[in-house]
From Swiss-Prot:
GO terms assigned for molecular function: guanyl-nucleotide exchange factor activity; identical protein binding; small GTPase binding
GO cellular component term of the entry, any: centrosome
InterPro entries: RAB3IL/RAB3IP/Sec2
Name of the protein described by the UniProt record: Rab-3A-interacting protein
Encoding gene, per UniProt annotation: Rab3ip
Broad class of where this protein is predominantly found: cytoplasm
Coiled coil: 149-212
Protein role: Guanine nucleotide exchange factor (GEF) which may activate RAB8A and RAB8B. Promotes the exchange of GDP to GTP, converting inactive GDP-bound Rab proteins into their active GTP-bound form. Mediates the release of GDP from RAB8A and RAB8B but not from RAB3A or RAB5. Modulates actin organization and promotes polarized transport of RAB8A-specific vesicles to the cell surface. Together with RAB11A, RAB8A, the exocyst complex, PARD3, PRKCI, ANXA2, CDC42 and DNMBP promotes transcytosis of PODXL to the apical membrane initiation sites (AMIS), apical surface formation and lumenogenesis.
Taxonomic lineage from the root: Eukaryota, Metazoa, Chordata, Craniata, Vertebrata
Source species: Mus musculus
Keywords linked to the UniProt accession: Cell projection, Coiled coil, Cytoplasm, Cytoskeleton, Guanine-nucleotide releasing factor, Nucleus, Phosphoprotein, Protein transport, Transport
Oligomer status and interactors: Homodimer. Interacts with the N-terminal region of SSX2. Interacts with the GDP-bound forms of RAB8A and RAB8B. The interaction with RAB8A is prevented by phosphorylation of RAB8A at 'Thr-72'. Interacts with the GDP-bound forms of RAB3A and RAB3D. Interacts with DCDC1. Interacts (via the N-terminal region) with TRAPPC14; this interaction mediates RAB3IP association with the TRAPP II complex. Forms a heterotetramer with RAB11A where RAB3IP homodimer binds two RAB11A subunits.
Length: 428
């Protein structure tokens, strides 16, 4: 019996003394005991370490160490008594006990593993189902937002938005530029129209003055004469028709013709002016200015004092001549050198005794020359001509076309011609 591998097997308890499964064995007065509806206690491996087993004995790792939840089981006292009834006799019940014990342990191990797997699977299934119910929407939305297709669509949307914004900005800038151009064009046209209106109003005023000055006075006086004629009763016999014809001839002789100023451009002068307008210059050798110098400027600035006249012309060309009234400086403070160049009653250009109300200064010189109203008008007419062509050269005349510029130049030449012929305007 000492070498028997199953020696001492009857001393091993398959359950803990406190296990509900063997309460019927510990308490003989209890006929039937039920376990907890959901907990079954299994023996711990430490309870089996007292009896060593051989190779064909039970393995400690096969025994469960944790409680396994299962459906409630009911054990009869008869089953417990059967297990314990055979235990005292080891000689007769060792083979049957080993076989039955191995069978029960194997089946119990399989059931425990199945129950554990089932419970773990159920727990995992319930947890995953709960998580899916709670976080399902957020997980799906995050996965969709992070997907490459959504990112690609977002990038394309951003690029499309940037393109649309840039296009809208370009269109806005284009509209602003067009509006500015239209505004500038409208302002230019308005200024030109105002200039034309001023010219037309001046022409209308001149025509009215001309018509009123040239209209005969007899038609206006005839109604007055007829009104003053006393009324006579009866009638007078017209002795002959010759008297009626004679009266009509007298009326025709009294009526004066109505005339108006007409103008027509000389083609040669107009072509020369257009050529000069394309490339404006102040050089007197160009055909346009050379003709004006010969016909208007030189005759207008020709005086008895030739040296002073040449100096005046040079100052006019250089735009350094100044004219000022005599009243700005009292006569008693006039220097002797200025008196030698004329005086309040002697013109320095003609040498004639004339009342001089103005004086000229050439450049920065302190010497003043007294001039008569006639000489002053001739000098100012030339200065006006040079001032206008300088404006054209500098591009300051923008409200007039070529025709208007040409007639303005002709008007200035007309003033120079009248001045050299002796016509001038004096300030009262």
């Amino acid at each position: 019996m000492a070498n028997d591998p199953l020696e001492g097997f009857h001393e091993v308890n398959l359950a803990s003394p406190t296990s509900p499964d063997l309460l019927g064995v510990c308490d003989p007065g209890t006929q039937e005991q039920t376990t907890s509806p959901s907990v079954i206690y299994r023996p711990h491996p430490s309870t089996l370490c007292a009896a060593p087993l051989q190779a064909n004995a039970l393995d400690l790792s096969d025994l469960p160490t944790q409680p396994v939840y299962s459906s409630p089981r009911h054990f009869n006292c008869a089953e417990v008594s059967n297990i314990s009834a055979h235990a005292p006799d080891p000689a007769s019940s060792v083979p049957s006990a080993v076989a039955s014990g191995l069978t029960k342990l194997t089946s119990r191990k399989d059931s425990c593993n199945a129950e554990r797997e089932f419970l773990q699977g159920a727990t995992i299934t319930e947890a995953s189902a709960g998580n899916d119910d709670i976080f399902g929407l957020s997980t799906d939305s995050l996965s969709r937002l992070r997907s490459p297709s959504v990112l690609e669509v977002r990038e394309k949307g951003y690029e499309r938005l940037k393109e649309e914004l840039a296009k809208a900005q370009r269109e806005a800038h284009k509209m602003v530029r067009e509006a500015n151009v239209k505004q500038a064009t409208a302002e230019k046209q308005l200024k030109e129209a105002q200039g034309k209106i001023d010219v037309l109003q001046a022409e209308v005023a001149a025509l009215k003055t001309l018509v009123l000055s040239s209209s005969p006075t007899s038609p206006t006086q005839e109604p007055l004469a007829a009104a003053k004629t006393p009324f006579k009763r009866g009638h007078t016999r017209n002795k002959s028709t010759s008297s009626a014809m004679g009266g009509s001839h007298q009326d025709l002789s009294v009526i004066q013709p109505i005339v108006k100023d007409c103008k027509e451009a000389d083609l040669s002068l107009y072509n020369e002016f257009r050529s000069w307008k394309d490339e404006p210059t102040m050089d007197r050798t160009c055909p346009f200015l050379d003709k004006i110098y010969q016909e208007d400027i030189f005759p207008c600035l020709t005086f008895a004092k030739s040296e002073l006249a040449s100096a005046v012309l040079e100052a006019v060309e250089n735009n350094t001549l100044s004219i000022e009234p005599v009243g700005l400086q009292p006569i008693r403070f006039v220097k002797a050198s200025a008196v030698e160049c004329g005086g309040p009653k002697k013109c320095a250009l003609t040498g004639q005794s004339k009342p001089c109300r103005h004086r000229i200064r050439l450049g920065d010189s302190s010497c003043c020359y007294y001039i008569s109203p006639f000489c002053r008008y001739r000098i100012t007419s030339v200065c006006n001509f040079f001032t206008y062509i300088r404006y054209i050269q500098q591009g300051l005349v923008k409200q007039q076309d070529v025709d208007q510029m040409f007639w303005e130049v002709m008007q200035l030449r007309k003033e120079m011609s009248l001045a050299k012929l002796g016509y001038f305007k004096e300030e009262l």
